[in-house]
Amino acid sequence: MTSKGPEEEHPSVTLFRQYLRIRTVQPKPDYGAAVAFFEERARQLGLGCQKVEVAPGYVVTVLTWPGTNPTLSSILLNSHTDVVPVFKEHWSHDPFEAFKDSEGYIYARGAQDMKCISIQYLEAVRRLKVEGHRFPRTIHMTFVPDEEVGGHQGMELFVQRPEFHALRAGFALDEGIANPTDAFTVFYSERSPWWVRVTSTGRPGHASRFMEDTAAEKLHKVVSSILAFREKEWQRLQSNPHLKEGSVTSVNLTKLEGGVAYNVIPATMSASFDFRVAPDVDFKAFEEQLQSWCQAAGEGVTLEFAQKWMHPQVTPTDDSNPWWAAFSRVCKDMKLTLEPEIMPAATDNRYIRAVGIPALGFSPMNRTPVLLHDHDERLHEAVFLRGVDIYTRLLPALASVPALPSES
């Protein structure tokens, strides 16, 4: 794949690079510039534009293309505007320059996650409007802050607001992930993030002594139990070629805290873990297992949750789901191979599914290395433009799904 010269650059690519240059990077994203960018897109495309401030300084921008039948539920195209931090010294090019090399690769933070999707939505809608199309169902595009740090000041609040309910969303698309093969990954569910801190208290004393009932000994027992569980899940994944990472529960020890000096046995120590719990797990039984490991370690061992998502939802991927039927039919017609999976991480789709809206996570980037959050995150312009083509086919099918029994 080679690149066109600057004078020949596709206008969609130019717009993509313009958006990439907006520094919506955590922890201090320039959300105001992003909102202004989408307001201008709405003006140019003749779309409705609504700004919803879900928390001070956190604005969800909603662009709306009305359908011909307002009694039908709408299509929601969601994307987040923030991106993760960068280590500039590890990048070949400035991560906010949107540099395009001679081969057509665009280097920028957000190139894959997920500013490409935002522009692909917009450009697909632009094409369809220019061609004079109208569809029965309204299409809403939501551009949401805060996803990269949990969405607690973004989609989590937005789905609770009357402005969200007024959208009457019947189906949603959000981000997926690149796929290095010919296939396209599509996510129909997500693992649930549980952030757990285990605290152990014990006898303090001088570090030259063999003290009993120390905080470290008891914490070691819990850590060993959890890491043994981790190994068991890892082996289950490795031994079954049909399982994907999102189908098992992962855990990583992410923080150890305790101690005041080399020669003092600490009275308190703690370990923090990031669990990603598979949607088919019995959450009550799993929490009881965590508690039992703490109890088995001895007195004075407790756990607390910094985050505990308890609402896993699965969007059916068969013809019983008319949204999936429409989505997969277009992909089949375009000869796109789909690989349905459970998202191993967490996205804003979990909040959307939790309020009863079926949703798929889909980023049309095949033959592309997975570089989200990585140094030199990049996307080839041809892959980006192919994504616009795909959405240009998907949106008419989804926005023309016949009235469901609940809508008649």
Swiss-Prot record:
PROSITE patterns associated with the record: ARGE_DAPE_CPG2_1, ARGE_DAPE_CPG2_2
Organism domain of life: Eukaryota
Catalytic activity, as annotated: an N-acyl-L-amino acid + H2O = an L-alpha-amino acid + a carboxylate; N-acetyl-L-methionine + H2O = L-methionine + acetate; N-acetyl-L-glutamine + H2O = L-glutamine + acetate
Annotated residues for binding of Zn(2+) 1: H80, D113, E175
Gene Ontology terms describing biological process: amino acid metabolic process
Alphabetized InterPro entries for the sequence: Aminoacylase-1_M20A, ArgE/DapE_CS, Bact_exopeptidase_dim_dom, N-acyl_aa_amidohydrolase, Peptidase_M20, Peptidase_M20_dimer
Obligatory cofactor(s): Zn(2+)
Enzyme class, spelled out: hydrolase
Gene Ontology MF terms in the entry: aminoacylase activity; metal ion binding
Described purpose of this protein according to its UniProt entry: Catalyzes the hydrolysis of N-acetylated amino acids to acetate and free amino acids.
Family to which the UniProt record says this protein belongs: Belongs to the peptidase M20A family.
Protein name: Aminoacylase-1
Organism: Pongo abelii
